[in-house]
């Protein structure tokens, strides 16, 4: 397989990932609304730790575990930033 074919497959996966991440962010909007209504804080460390543990168990190839968990940590960090922004804009 040549590099262009590999990159084409990566591009296809990127498209799928973007669609899944948008669906995830739609759910983050619902979480934000819930937190706004209940006064819960944006950061839930126990939830994030549970997600990272669960994700780590899902990874089948040990060599990928750390990178995939780091990716999910980044996703959750971006979700927190988004939630904080939405909550701050709602208060104004």
Label every model-predicted segment.
Residues 1-92:
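Domain-level signature for soluble enzymes in the chorismate/prephenate branch of the shikimate pathway
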